[in-house]
Amino acid sequence: MFTFIPITHPTSDTKHPLLLVQSAHGEKYFFGKIGEGSQRSLTENKIRISKLKDIFLTGELNWSDIGGLPGMILTIADQGKSNLVLHYGNDILNYIVSTWRYFVFRFGIDLNDHIMKDKEVYKDKIIAVKSFNVLKNGGEDRLGVFDSFQKGVLRSIVAKMFPKHAPTDRYDPSSDPHLNVELPDLDAKVEVSTNYEISFSPVRGKFKVEEAIKLGVPKGPLFAKLTKGQTITLDNGIVVTPEQVLENERHFAKVLILDIPDDLYLNAFVEKFKDYDCAELGMVYYFLGDEVTINDNLFAFIDIFEKNNYGKVNHMISHNKISPNTISFFGSALTTLKLKALQVNNYNLPKTDRVFSKDFYDRFDTPLSRGTSMCKSQEEPLNTIIEKDNIHIFSQNKTVTFEPFRMNEEPMKCNINGEVADFSWQEIFEEHVKPLEFPLADVDTVINNQLHVDNFNNSAEKKKHVEIITLGTGSALPSKYRNVVSTLVKVPFTDADGNTINRNIMLDAGENTLGTIHRMFSQLAVKSIFQDLKMIYLSHLHADHHLGIISVLNEWYKYNKDDETSYIYVVTPWQYHKFVNEWLVLENKEILKRIKYISCEHFINDSFVRMQTQSVPLAEFNEILKENSNQESNRKLELDRDSSYRDVDLIRQMYEDLSIEYFQTCRAIHCDWAYSNSITFRMDENNEHNTFKVSYSGDTRPNIEKFSLEIGYNSDLLIHEATLENQLLEDAVKKKHCTINEAIGVSNKMNARKLILTHFSQRYPKLPQLDNNIDVMAREFCFAFDSMIVDYEKIGEQQRIFPLLNKAFVEEKEEEEDVDDVESVQDLEVKLKKHKKN
């Protein structure tokens, strides 16, 4: 038996479909897209992937499609997995993985790629997968975009990213001549969709013992040979074939997984599959991009698979106007609801509304909730020969099991289980919140009066105040209750005419930051947030702090591309700038023209500006590969001397554009090229003394000298990491993080007026340590929770509900799991050594 389990489907915070195929013995395969949030969905649903060995990527490979893959690979490696194969139909895959070389590094896992030609078959003892590569505009399949030399370079880089043995304790990929290499140029965007046919090895028929004995076969080794499908000859010369003593083989239905990115692919798909042999086809999964129109043209293609097989094929459709916008992360949503019951104006109810395809739902007579928004693509009803019972909506709970059947004797066995459950905030409130008996928390106050309320920047008073949204507040990797870190700070500015202009600044953006924004806000509010987004700041290169930035940049461009005067400042360690350039050349070059990049190092509060290393040119890298290992290890990269000169002109322009008085960084005590920062904003054009200073620690040990007493001193707001509880000081020292008390100590020495503590270890996912902390000298402080919206003027209001917070999470504590905070190769080495000792 084989089970197909949807891991994600198109929702606000999981944009694409991902399918897990699992055998009866536990072998696992992924098919589809590894979008941001995929790993968190596995955690939410307690799905283990220790037996995962193959990932078959479908469709195109934009960041939206595979933004969750880097984090997924890191986690799989940290779990001790020794091998993983990525399958795809174009060698752009190696380029993609190579772009991650400055921030994805794990030893002990053998990561391989398998570039599949059109109609090539990959086979193991369980499964056979045939690829179908469809070019956007038709034509002959072009397997690759690189020549043999370039392919060799890319493969070498990927191999060095995943070495067999651990490097020295201090390792900087940007100083490794095998990683800091110029990547090959891309001439054009790769527009190919990879699709798959899945078939399973048949089940051998039962051995008919009595029949074998009748034929004179003695018990023993000859029975075994016949069972294995071997023909035997008896002593009397009689030949006995397996067919004489075995029941008929049992087969499984075939499955197609088709990924159509947009309407321009449709004709090529029709051409590719018009003569497809539908015999034994039991299910077709359609992974439809947002730009695919639900109309007759689409269903004319789908009808192809009904020919000579009418009524026998099931069709499972994934599309953002068909699949429900269900809550993907219920644990997180329930946490938000409980916190909202305590501070109703500090949280938005997660959005579950969606505009559905009226064409689809009318044609297949599928019910929707009252008041659902719908849209039509054509005037006439959908024209298709598919019956209602054979069309299915792809969603997280819609599992399919395939069981073996005897061909020509019984029908294919394809069992579809699971329906979308009705979702009601009111019912969830009654079940999980009402029993807590919070004062003033009733269903009208928390739910009914808040269904369409946006609590961010929603009053005349708030429009004049600094506001903070702690989008993600966890460390290392996404958990059930906290996503990885990201903070949005809105700083208003009053111009000479008294008009208020917002400056939104994003401080770090871990994986699926955009998904959180989409779940929190309406489309109109999202547009406003991104039109006001002026800067993205990245503190360091650990993946949990930046895997969401590309999605944020794409979303910013979506709402600002028509305004040619609009730019976004991106302030990051220099290596991340290289990644952005390499990635956006692949996906959307136009965004690069609208990014103004400045290195974190150019804001350093020091006379010494550290130089970045120069990348090795491709031609020179070829010579390095020919050298022996001793020569390789002794080779040093050259420094880029120009990089030590601050980009003063661009910094001045940023100061002017964003009305900034000072922007300073200091080196964080964490990993190489890690920073803390302080930004002083002007607040009123008519009052030069009206300023607001915000400081952000990033990840660091307490840095009193440089951060508290120098760049951050007298901050109006300090946002500081508080990764570990106070009793875990030894862990904090080892991992170069802060305990809660240490973070408070930094604030006290800084003389910060207000303090927000964030970036909590996922070992304590719901509630940080509220008591036994040292005194906070700041006027007000609070602990950050995911999706929390807080007015700077009211940061201290959370302290009033501290006594109720422990009560709020009694239910969750009963099922709490201890998740290790693994951030570095050294953490993994320690774990492996302990394991060997045991």
UniProtKB/Swiss-Prot annotation:
InterPro entries (alphabetical): RibonucZ/Hydroxyglut_hydro (IPR036866), RNZ2-like (IPR047151), tRNase_Z_dom (IPR027794)
The entry sums up its family as follows: Belongs to the RNase Z family.
Enzyme class per UniProt: hydrolase
What Gene Ontology molecular function terms does this protein carry?
3'-tRNA processing endoribonuclease activity; metal ion binding
Q: Which SUPFAM superfamilies does UniProt cross-reference here? A: Metallo-hydrolase/oxidoreductase
- Name its species: Saccharomyces cerevisiae (strain ATCC 204508 / S288c) (Baker's yeast)
Spell out the protein name for this chain. Ribonuclease Z
- Chief localisation class: cytoplasm
Q: What is its EC number?
A: 3.1.26.11
Pfam families given in the database record: Lactamase_B_4
Modified positions (Phosphoserine) in chain numbering: S824
Which Gene Ontology BP terms does the record give?
mitochondrial tRNA 3'-end processing; tRNA 3'-end processing
**What's a single GO CC term here?**
mitochondrion
**What's the catalysed reaction?**
Endonucleolytic cleavage of RNA, removing extra 3' nucleotides from tRNA precursor, generating 3' termini of tRNAs. A 3'-hydroxy group is left at the tRNA terminus and a 5'-phosphoryl group is left at the trailer molecule
What are the required cofactors?
Zn(2+)
Function per UniProt: Zinc phosphodiesterase, which displays some tRNA 3'-processing endonuclease activity. Probably involved in tRNA maturation, by removing a 3'-trailer from precursor tRNA.
What keywords appear on the UniProt entry? Cytoplasm, Endonuclease, Hydrolase, Metal-binding, Nuclease, Nucleus, Phosphoprotein, tRNA processing, Zinc
Localization per record: Cytoplasm; Nucleus
